[in-house]
Amino acid sequence: MSEFLQSIHYGSWILPVLLALPLVGAGILWLHGFVAERALRTGPASDDTARWVTLGTFLVMFIVSTGLWWAFDPHGGWQFEFDTAWLPQWGIRFSLALDGISIFLVLLTTFLMPIAVLSGWTSIDKRVHTYHGLFLILTTAMLGVFMARDTFLFYVMWEVVLVPMFFIIGIWGGERRMYAATKFFVYTFLGSLLMLVAILYLGLAAADPVTGRPDFSYDAILAVAQTLSSTERLWLFFAFFAAFAVKIPLFPFHTWLPDAHVEAPTEGSVDLAAILLKMGTYGLLRFSLPLFPDVVTNPAVRNVVLALAVTGVIYGALVALVQTDFKRLVAYSSVSHMGLVVLGIFALTAESLQGAMMVQLSHGLSTGALFLMIGMLYDRRHTRLFSAFGGLARVMPLYGLFLMISVMSSIAVPGTNGFIGEFLVLTGSFQTYPVLATIATVSVVLAAVFVLWALQRVLFNPLDKPENMTIPDMNWREVAMMAPIAALIFYIGLHPAPLLRRMEPRLQELIQQVDPTSVRTSSTAVPGSAGGGN
């Protein structure tokens, strides 16, 4: 496979093609919608065309992107590079590349987007062309965040994400959709403004001494950050951190998330939980740690961040326990899971960093799966309240099977994808912060309690409501959505070595940049991570 990919010069064109394909799809959708409206041919047939064009675009993207897995060299640093001038007078370039951190998030995005489209196949029946066009634009922006090697390009993509998601929630969401959409936009936009100031400051500081032209390339920003005073680096760290903390979201910046999840359509919730939240933790790994190592290792700063992370882990679990709405419960569980990711990042051990990467990938699959399952129930019963269900395992055996698999992944049952990440985060964090790691471990038990309780209320309580006795089981489309996720849940859980092997060199390099005393040999970092397999 690698030889074939080299023969077609795969690495030289794959990233710009992945960014361009959704935009081409969106253009086709809007052109088709315009022509259909002029010809007075709008209706179910026209809407189906929009759905198939979107699904086809995402399937092509996924198929093409699988080559990244085979062509990626774990020891190769930045790969699949594409660089061209964009706004040269301002030192801004259209520069793309992937490394052992970003490649997984790109693959997660291309894997989940066609599944997400299937989730709204029948439930979205108004302005279908616009709806799917917005999702295509959203996909380009999300991928751009993970691919960008120019910091200004990173910021542009970061902000573009807000616009389609605002309209998706605000137009196709629930009863309080405008409140949730506005809250989402305001929170994330205000945090991002501070990051913009920091990026401009660094780009100007890296300006060419002869021409005075700013330089926003990642390498230039990384180099100039080390020449600034400790006070400057402290303020710049917090400017970046504000944007990332809101997006993660880290406690106490999380209050926009439950409302956005509850009001968003299923497809929006899947993208929000599985991909958008990862932009925040990706930002920590890409910018906060390597640009400001002295701030990250400063005990005062580090302890505050770790305290917020562990508070979020416990808070999310406790609040989830008292929820009566299935979707809101999963939203608060996301606060808990993402707090665990931040704990792993700032514990700064080889194990905890690998665990953080694995937890965020596993969270994307498990939480995405849970939102898909909740969406199926809502399509049938138009409610998400636990009190409306009970005994569904008897009438929906397929649904019960896939919901149990999703729950097993979420609570990190051994053999599923969730286990290896949580195990590495907790064991790695225990080396440097045993008390915080112990507290976080308690939250894992709480997570099992609230998710299993939800499972009992939906599947195993008495089947005593007439509406539930005739509820149909999953159809072929819904099985097609869930089967790939279920397969990946068990594949990663039983064979995580290929993922760990691809991320380990880059994470070791990151630790070396931040805190050389934390570096350990790769043979002791993660048992089995050097193992074979693709």
Feature map (PLM): residue ranges:
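Alpha-helical transmembrane segments of multipass membrane proteins
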Residues: 26-31, 66, 114-118, 140-144, ...
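Transmembrane helix-loop-helix hairpins at membrane boundaries of multipass inner-membrane proteins
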Residues: 1-14, 29-133, 210-215, 219-223, ...
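Alpha-helical multi-pass transmembrane bundles of energy-transducing inner-membrane proteins
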Residues: 32, 36, 45-50, 130-228, ...
